Amino acid sequence: MKRLFKYTLIALAAILVLPAAFLCGLYLTADMEQPAVTIDTAAYRVTNHGGYTTCHGSFLRRNPHGLWELYTAGPPEESGAAAGALTAGLMHYQEQVFVDQIREFVPSEGYLKFLGGMIRIFNRNLGRHVPEEYRREIYARSLYCSHDFDAIGTPYERQLNYHAAHDIGHAMSQYMLVGCSSFAAWGGASDDGKPVVGRNFDFYMGDDFARNKIVTFCRPQAGYPFASIGWAGMIGVLSGMNSEGLTVTINAAKGPVPLASATPISILAREILQHAATIAEALEIARRRDTFVSESLLVASARDGRAAIIEKTPRRTVLYEGDGEYLICTNHYQSEAFDDDGDNRENIAMTDSPHRFARLEELMAANAPLGVPAAAAMLRDQRGTGGKDIGVGNDCSVNQSIAHHSVIFKPATLQMWVSTSPWQGGAFVCYDLGAILRNPDPAAELYDSAQEIPSDTAYLARDYPRVVAYRQLGARIRRAMKAGRKADGELIETFAQTNPQNFHTWKLLGEYYLSQGDDGRAAQSFGKALEAGIPRRDELLAIERLKSECKP
């Protein structure tokens, strides 16, 4: 019996220790494939010209609308080092905001370190899935990163991992970090017969994360020059257009839970933008790369005179072309190849993606043939299907007041219009990519003020203050719940009146009243949430369950 007890203890110890040792081994042997390049950072001195800064053939400026404009050129390590030197302060700001937001999602320091270790293990082979050219550029930029966050990883490891931020947010969809809407029209569906593309990049990491948007104009050593919209440190592409009139935008979709790292979707989009001029070339590049999340890439081409959607999962790549002269893309797949896909069917049944898709269908029909001003109006639309008032910040809205950026492309003329704060409410600033590439003059304004789309004055006067107040009041109620204390009655009433059409308002109030043991008011609030309409079926079922559990 003693021997059996001894062997049982040994077996239990092995069960506990061996997996830990295995994970420790994976952690210690993680290899991000840092490039073996030597860069003399002293050679990359930043010169301030009073309005813009320059470094080694690259420059950074900020336009009157608050958009940062970065021009880079040359080999990856040179353009990367120059960009790193120019944007060092912005990179620190962006990283601080990112880390602070993650801490808000995951307040436990111990669990945060655990997640950091797991991400390191998960992404242990990430480097081999990123082309060396891009790893060299990322490494060069990382030389100018702060060491304030070295507990997370080395600057190079952190910057490489941040390129999978969209993918990680995609996997954390329950936090609603990602939920984009895009569309394209051409032929008889556009006002001049040529493609027009619009997109909202709804990647939300807090309001501060979108405060310093960067419009990058990149002339790489190899491939096509291009423009893209992102943030400091990001060399991947989220939304962009190249000199051949090819545009790429990315929209998250639902797929199997990733089990190993692969190519971040922003890196794939960068590769397409840099090396493709047609939809066929974009598809060929997409098929060569394995990605570890599911994504839709809306690609429009001036040469082809149309657009198509590359629907990609870790297992397959499908081209969806539709049967008309326009395409709409939210967060689910549309091709027949995914008709029987369980993840996609669940996505359509359970999420708000079909609601935004249906609203865009209505707007496309109402605005045909589509021009640039009408595209901006579509991107700013806050109504539900049938024009229903669903409040502000609703998941069913095309404009949820969370977009990092909104952009409109005219591939045939190489023009793009980029939104300015707040969200889509500010002016859309026009850039002529062809003119900028012909004469990248840092002393001159890069945008074309004559083509500017004015700000949405009605939104700024009426809805923007509501959004800000609504989120601030909601945060105060959540803090009261977390602290186990009663919220001020006036606070509750003001919150309810600020955004009564949005189901989130009544859901939060129901949860608050439950925390106070007031089942009657909780049930009443949950009932109002159900009456307002809830886009996500999983959320609908959860609220129905909460309401049913309230005591009479």
Report each predicted region and the residues it spans:
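Short, flexible segments with low predicted structural confidence
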Residues: 9, 108-111, 253-257
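Acidic, Ser/Thr-rich peripheral helices and adjacent loops at domain boundaries
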Residues: 317-322
